[in-house]
UniProtKB/Swiss-Prot annotation:
Compartment annotation: Virion; Host nucleus; Host early endosome; Host Golgi apparatus
Cysteine-cysteine disulfides: C21-C27
UniProt motif (Nuclear localization signal) ranges: 1-12, 442-450
GO MF annotation terms: DNA binding; structural molecule activity
Keywords: Capsid protein, Cytoplasmic inwards viral transport, Disulfide bond, DNA-binding, Host endosome, Host Golgi apparatus, Host nucleus, Host-virus interaction, Late protein, Microtubular inwards viral transport, Phosphoprotein, Viral penetration into host nucleus, Virion, Virus entry into host cell
Superkingdom, taxonomy of origin: Viruses
Disulfide bond keyword on record: yes
Name of the protein described by the UniProt record: Minor capsid protein L2
């Protein structure tokens, strides 16, 4: 027995369900958004329309009506038909043209002729004219007189010019026949413009020179006494000449004590001076004054720690050695003049004006001893004798007289060189190779002097 299939009943549409279930609140979840146009597609169009305008295309979820203007049928426009026939000309208004002046310009134009002094032409009258004649008794004789020519020369002095006249007038000379003149030249008044002061000086007296005085910049100070440096005083004098002896053993090849010194220690070692332990670098020396002392300073770098990259980490130490104190003098020494106060003349032939001595006689000078005795040449007050030491060799003598003749030593035997023992003939050297003398193998190099200041030390 065949079973009859149950008839399927059509489900109500969303609009019908919305009308019955909206009030009771039993609508399926997809009915209300579809009827109220609140689906995801509607929300996309709603929020996208804020930034995009499609005009009147009518894009939406409603019926496809083509928007407010409807659809335009897609058909080609018909071509306009061209009919053959006579073409009528448009009416043209013809304006009358009047004749104008000719455009031809004559190249030859008559000039106006003015006859000054000619008799005026009187037009004839209709009634005719009358001719009047008279006899002339005065003969036509011209008065011929002798013509005299006058020449005038004018010379200007370029040296002299009147100061008050800016543009002098040309000279004017006149006589009975010639007159030379020129228009008057007037000078314009000079406009005075006050000068503006651009440089403002604070001093009342004003600047004394146009070139400013350059300021003296302070000299940079080396930070030898900062907190980052450890101060160590050295008492060994070898620190001045060979500081490497205080750190490592003496190296005879080393030269130059005024440069930076570097040391490399491969193993643990003891320095000759404990103050220079683990020193890997000594910077250049510097000489300065500190509290009345002349101080010789060097900056040292310790290598207490070594990293794998080869970098050394350590403290910086300031080594200094006081050379000598700068003390003031304990007492002041008065300077005395080297020349005596009296103006004495040490002349062995000076005349004496003392009483009891004949002025025509010369003073007696005893030269048997090694001293000469002289009397000063004074008039007002006698002074004591001045003894001048004079040493005379045994082979020299003095000759009396107004002049002193210096003795001459006898000439000795002329020197004659000894004949050399080497052969005097020509010397020939034959050979293909030569050797340099051992003294020239190592030529001493000139050491470059470097100023004593820290060029590689941070201040």
């Amino acid at each position: 027995m065949a079973h009859s299939r149950a008839r399927r009943r059509k489900r109500a549409s969303a609009t019908q369900l919305y009308q019955t279930c909206k009030l009771t609140g039993t609508c399926p979840p997809d009915v209300i958004p579809k009827v109220e146009h609140n689906t995801i597609a509607d929300q996309i169009l709603k929020w996208g329309s804020l930034g995009v305008f499609f005009g009147g295309l009518g894009i939406g979820t409603g019926s496809g009506t083509g928007g407010r203007t409807g659809y335009v049928p897609l058909q080609t426009s018909a071509k306009p038909s061209i009919t053959s026939g006579p073409m009528a000309r448009p009416p043209v208004v013809v304006e009358p043209v009047a004749p104008s002046d000719p455009s031809i310009v004559s190249l030859i134009e008559e000039s106006a002729i003015i006859n000054a002094g000619a008799p005026e032409i009187v037009p004839p009258a209709h009634g005719g004219f009358t001719i009047t004649s008279s006899e002339t008794t005065t003969p036509a004789i011209l008065d011929v007189s002798v013509t005299s020519h006058t020449t005038t020369s004018i010379f200007r002095n370029p040296v002299f010019t009147e100061p008050s006249v800016t543009q002098p007038q040309p000279p004017v000379e006149a006589n009975g026949h010639i007159l030379i003149s020129a228009p008057t030249v007037t000078s314009h008044p000079i406009e005075e413009i006050p000068l503006d002061t651009f440089v403002v000086s604070s001093s009342d007296s004003g600047p004394t020179s146009s070139t400013p005085v350059p300021g003296t910049a302070p000299r940079p100070r080396v930070g030898l006494y900062s907190r980052a440096l450890h101060q160590v005083q050295v008492t060994d004098p070898a620190f001045l000449s060979t500081p490497q002896r205080l750190i490592t053993y003496d190296n005879p090849v080393y030269e130059g004590e005024d440069v930076s010194v570097q040391f490399s220690h491969d193993s643990i070692h003891n320095a000759p001076d404990e103050a220079f332990m683990d020193i890997i670098r000594l910077h250049r020396p510097a000489i300065a004054s500190r509290r009345g002392l002349v101080r010789y300073s060097r900056i040292g770098q310790r290598g207490s720690m070594h990293t794998r990259s080869g970098k050394h980490i350590g403290a910086r130490i300031h080594y200094f050695y006081d050379i000598s104190p700068i003390a003031q003098a304990a007492e002041e020494i008065e300077m005395h003049p080297l020349v005596a106060a009296q103006d004495d003349t040490f002349d062995i032939y000076a005349e004496s004006f003392e009483p009891g001595i004949n002025p025509t006689q010369h003073p007696v000078t005893n030269i048997s001893d090694t001293y000469l005795t002289s009397t000063p040449n004074t008039v007002t007050q006698p002074w004591g004798n001045t003894t001048v030491p004079l040493s005379l060799p045994n082979d020299l003598f003095l000759q009396s007289g107004p002049d002193i003749t210096f003795p001459t030593a006898p000439m000795g035997t002329p020197f004659s060189p000894v004949t050399p023992a080497l052969p005097t003939g020509p010397v020939f050297i034959t050979g293909s190779g030569f050797y340099l003398h051992p003294a020239w193998y190592f030529a001493r190099k000139r050491r470059k002097r470097i100023p004593l200041f820290f060029s590689d030390v941070a201040a």
